[in-house]
């Protein structure tokens, strides 16, 4: 059995410890637009006007710690910028914010910069 090729991922929710800190990263550094915010409990962010690509919430995680190494869970999320210029602009914001960068590579089909969000 194979999944229908028209299926896509509508959005992903991330449990974060602090909405303001998460928005400072996803909005101010990576460049996402805030589509809706529910105080300090949740924010829904998007690129291009979609209702939300990422949900950020503190419903079960306010003030929490990142999971310890060696545990299961989400490994990474790839955010594709449309071209090198736009990726470069995001990289410039990361550098200006002195955000730690874990690495970078050219996959042949895409170029990647690896980093961790405020919650690891």
Model-predicted regions and their roles:
Residues 1-20, 74-79:
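N-terminal beta-strand motif that seeds the catalytic metal site of vicinal oxygen chelate
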Residues 8, 41, 52, 73-75, ...:
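Residues that flank catalytic or metal-binding motifs in active/ligand-binding sites
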Residues 6, 14-60:
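Core segments of cupin and vicinal oxygen chelate
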Residues 44-49, 65-70, 113-114:
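Short glycine-biased active-site loop of nucleotidyltransferases that positions the nucleotide triphosphate
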Residues 18-19, 82-86, 119:
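Helix N-cap motif at beta-to-alpha junctions
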Residues 11-13, 51-54, 76, 107:
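Histidine-centered active-site/metal-ligand motif
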Residues 63-105:
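Aromatic/His-enriched, Gly/Pro-containing loop or helix-boundary segments
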Residues 1-3, 91-120:
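Vicinal oxygen chelate
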